[in-house]
A protein has these predicted regions:
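Structural boundary micro-motifs
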Residues: 1-57
Length: 57
């Protein structure tokens, strides 16, 4: 996928992404400072994840 395709397909609020098993996984920081992960349906809190380790959109 190109960066433009990744950005176009990203959910609202996503700021970072990673490729896992050939599919993009999106991340964001919520208003309390927790890293949130999007699995295609919902945002989940991702404990121990460092947002700096993921690529920016």
């Amino acid at each position: 996928m190109t960066p433009t395709q990744l950005k176009d397909q990203s959910p609202f609020g996503a700021t970072h992404y990673d490729i896992e098993q050939g599919k993009p996984v999106y991340y964001k920081i919520n208003n309390l400072g927790y890293t949130m992960r999007f699995d295609g349906k919902m945002w989940y809190i991702c404990h121990g994840a460092m947002i700096q380790n993921y690529r920016t959109l």
